UniProtKB/Swiss-Prot annotation:
One GO BP annotation of this record: septum digestion after cytokinesis
PANTHER family given in the database record: AMP-ACTIVATED PROTEIN KINASE, GAMMA REGULATORY SUBUNIT (PTHR13780), CBS DOMAIN-CONTAINING PROTEIN (PTHR13780:SF36)
Keyword Transcription: no
Positions of disulphide bridges: none
Keywords, ordered alphabetically: CBS domain, Cytoplasm, Nucleus, Repeat
Superkingdom to which the source organism belongs: Eukaryota
Molecular-function annotations in GO: protein serine/threonine phosphatase inhibitor activity
Organism: Candida glabrata (strain ATCC 2001 / BCRC 20586 / JCM 3761 / NBRC 0622 / NRRL Y-65 / CBS 138) (Yeast)
Primary role: Involved in DNA replication and cell separation.
Protein name (Swiss-Prot/TrEMBL): Protein SDS23
Family, similarity comment: Belongs to the SDS23 family.
Amino acid sequence: MTNPKNVVPNSGTSSRHASIVEMLSSPPLLPHQHAQHAHVHRSQGRSESIESIPLQRSASGTSSITSMGSNNDSSSANAQSANPSAGSATNVGASGTPHSGSGLEAGNTDLSAVPMLQTPSQCLNSAHIHTWKHIQLSQLIEQNKLIFVPGSLSVEETFNTLIKYHLTSIPVEAVPGDMNCLTFDYNDLNSYLLLVLNKITINNKQVTQDCQNGKPVAVGDIVKLTPKNPFYKLPETENLSTVMGILGSGVHRVAITNPEMTQIRGILSQRRLIKYIWDNARSFGTLEPLLNSSLQDLKIGVLNTNSKPTSRQSRVISIQGEEPLIMALYKMHKERISSIAVIDPQGNLIGNISVTDVKHVTRTSQYPLLHKTCRHFISVILNSRGLETGKDSFPIFHVYPTSSLARTLAKLVATKSHRLWIVQPQEAPTATSSSSTSSSVNTGTISPNPTPTTTSASPAPGATPNALNNHSPLLSTVDDGHTVINPATQATNTTVIQPNLFEKEYRTGKLIGVVSLTDIINLLARKQTANTEVDPQTARRQRGPATQ
């Protein structure tokens, strides 16, 4: 998100962290709008609801995007079908069926021309105005972050590389210049940890013994433990329409190559695509009807716990707050998910545990955390985040059925998560109360009083004494540069959130659904491109079952 302090008036000094409400109030401004931002906001009066985000520019600007009105409702989409040279695009259910008569996309005639400016970002904005779905993939990749590791590298060294370059995944080459890489991510790190703890079994006895005896294990062996999709590749000359058909099927990332498809130029992930769309939302006028629609109107996410999800919907997977953390990690591995909701006995959402949080238990000194409750682990994560960044606000991982798609996108970008939990507030919300409730939760801060931790560690289910006592190279030598969480010293050094404060600020309602990056990209692909039949569960079915 760019310049969050400029989004809402009276946001305070530039040194203060912007609240999430400020970040969610509207998409980021375009570069050439900054100079006229104050005038635009004075003219609009900022009276609109947070849940309804107008994307049209002020008439006083140097250029304008016409608001989607009745004149555009009858327009037919003339999306081009996917390029036949798109490589693996057809492997994941991308359809070439023409998309017409949706009423959600307008022709290019309603968009005024933007003069070409000198800076690269402003030149890119001009391309957005013409048509967003035909933007070439070369505009989206970060070539400076293209990093590979050899399959012979140890897991701990690969993990250190992830931390060093702030990556969530990294391609693993079997041989130099390998164009069919597997990727190492935090799901693989979780599998490695579970193997060390003897919570899962694999057919390779040598790898199992090395893991449990603390010997280095090649990352090339570990990446094979977690079922993965094929390494999809697209040339950088392809466009957004094509890649949406792939990422909208549940594939998490796509390699972007040179036009000849002989060299990988970068990696485009679901999360980066969503951030790109949100950062440039003001340029994508045809998306306005979708962005201002609610999740329940768009029919994405599971919104009724009394009926089973359809074949195109994600299941709501949760764990009780009093269950041990090790069970949450095992459940994420078994279900092949990257985060899990933590609920109380009544089904109310009390928190979120992500597979990236496994980095907090990669040291042998942190083993006791594995046997403490999920509720306790959430408080430890929040405390650690406060020590590292100075932030005292709760991250918000939930939305409501009435939340707009724009608000959902903004929260996904702000939290850098792959999914948000849909909750039903304790009282049936109206259009006004829902926005008010969400605002009060989003701006909530914590000022916890020190509370000693007295929970004792107990062996994880299925973990042998040998597994608990060995010193894995990863668990003993990895230094991620962050605050080290040591349960042995928590009783005197750690500030833990009091239960009553924790529940007041973070418990927001009954868990009734989940909306993921795949759901949203799939929606955009079906409504705005030629990929009208793309199935969001295709990639999950391809991956098959995980290691038991």
